[in-house]
């Protein structure tokens, strides 16, 4: 009985297996435009590559799979280059961080490189911010310790006692400086540019900089607002952009890192809501017309 069931399953699966796309057998030099007859193959396993999409007025339609829903043009669609040598197929993505995937042409595997690409970009941004904060902490701490050491050198103490006090103050000041700089509330007057504002300040920033990426949690192309639970879920596109926020006394500023640099200044105590995305797109359109 089990053998009969297995044969029936194989009989049903055979048309599906036979319908799987396979590329040509000849070598394919590195190219941005694979042969039209191979599009079904490449767009099955490298579906985010630009040669799989026709885009017009910001709306993109899949060239191969007609039932695929229309999507908005965003950084999910990347410029790709594909090649084939013997039985090895590979595709490369041209982005800030180059990614590539090599697979067997006759036994390909789907690789969701976009999710990994976004994670790598996010980790790299966080690492850079942490390095900046660490360097600032070290400079400030060394300056303070130098002053404290100079003062204690004038006091009559045993060398061991003086050393212990010096090391204790060094550790204490280092911890305090790190906590202060990494968790600046809105009430402080210290300037600091942050990729991720403190969680307690999210409501403020996401009210006046609602398009910034730190206000959204995105998964599988759908984004949910972190602060306002009644906000409808939206699709992930270039409406959501990378932002950094900073403040100086009562001046709050957020910067949008889009195709051009854009920033908005406002009073922290009397903030002004600005639809900066519309203004940003207007600048981009004007630049494209030049």
Swiss-Prot record:
InterPro entries, per this entry? ASFV_fam_110 (IPR004848)
Q: Which UniProt keywords apply?
A: Early protein, Membrane, Repeat, Signal, Transmembrane, Transmembrane helix
Report whether Transmembrane shows up as a keyword of the record: yes
- Which residues pair up as cystines? none
Query: What protein name applies here?
Result: Protein MGF 110-9L
Q: Which Pfam families match?
A: v110
Q: Which GO terms describe its cellular component?
A: membrane
The membrane topology term of the UniProt record is: Multi-pass membrane protein
Q: Indicate the secretion signal residues.
A: 1-19
Q: Where are the B repeats?
A: 161-290
Give the organism, scientific name.
African swine fever virus (isolate Portugal/Lis 57/1957)
Instruction: Give the record's family classification.
Output: Belongs to the asfivirus MGF 110 family.
Primary location class: membrane
Is the Iron-sulfur keyword given for this protein? no
Q: Which domain of life is it from?
A: Viruses
Q: Where does the record place it?
A: Membrane
What residue spans do the A repeats cover? 1-160
Q: Please give the start and end residues of each transmembrane region.
A: 128-148, 163-183
